[in-house]
Amino acid sequence: MALIYPDNLRYFDSHEYVRLDGDIAVIGISAYAIDQLGDIVFLELPEVGSTIAIGASFGTVESVKAVEEVYAPVTGEIIERNEAALEAPEILNSDPYEQGWLLKVQLTGKPDLSDSYDAAQYQALVEGQ
């Protein structure tokens, strides 16, 4: 199955993505990372009201193959976490971008996306691995 990388997202080396909506960032894990992990069986995410800082680990994703940390691509306060994904983590396998997002974050300042990739750049990066 071909992996999809939506054009409206920014992607990072650690395989998280960000969708910006004004000063709100939606954070998730790319289809490539999900494909590499296999079937997702457990998620651990911080509580609403917590803050995350760019580059810091904020949770874990457990699959049948491995447990991986998830890193914050932006800094801000968590205003929503995906409770549906926490209850049924396999949703990340079927729809990592729409239903399988992880957190919504109120940004602290303007996000630094200089280390991010657009969809075409990210696809070239992961297909070269």
Curated annotation (Swiss-Prot):
Pfam families named in the record: GCV_H (PF01597)
GO biological process: glycine decarboxylation via glycine cleavage system
N6-lipoyllysine modified-residue sites: 65
Lipoyl-binding domain mapped to chain residues: 24-106
Domain of life: Bacteria
Entry-linked Gene3D superfamilies: 2.40.50.100
Cofactor(s) listed: (R)-lipoate
Cofactor-binding details, from the entry: Binds 1 lipoyl cofactor covalently.
Cellular compartments per GO CC: cytosol; glycine cleavage complex
Entry keyword set: Lipoyl
PANTHER family noted in UniProt: GLYCINE CLEAVAGE SYSTEM H PROTEIN, GLYCINE CLEAVAGE SYSTEM H PROTEIN-RELATED
NCBIfam families noted in UniProt: gcvH, PRK01202.1
Family named by the database record: Belongs to the GcvH family.
Function: The glycine cleavage system catalyzes the degradation of glycine. The H protein shuttles the methylamine group of glycine from the P protein to the T protein.
Assembly information from the UniProt record: The glycine cleavage system is composed of four proteins: P, T, L and H.
Annotated protein name in UniProt: Glycine cleavage system H protein
Organism, as annotated: Synechococcus elongatus (strain ATCC 33912 / PCC 7942 / FACHB-805)
GN (gene name): gcvH
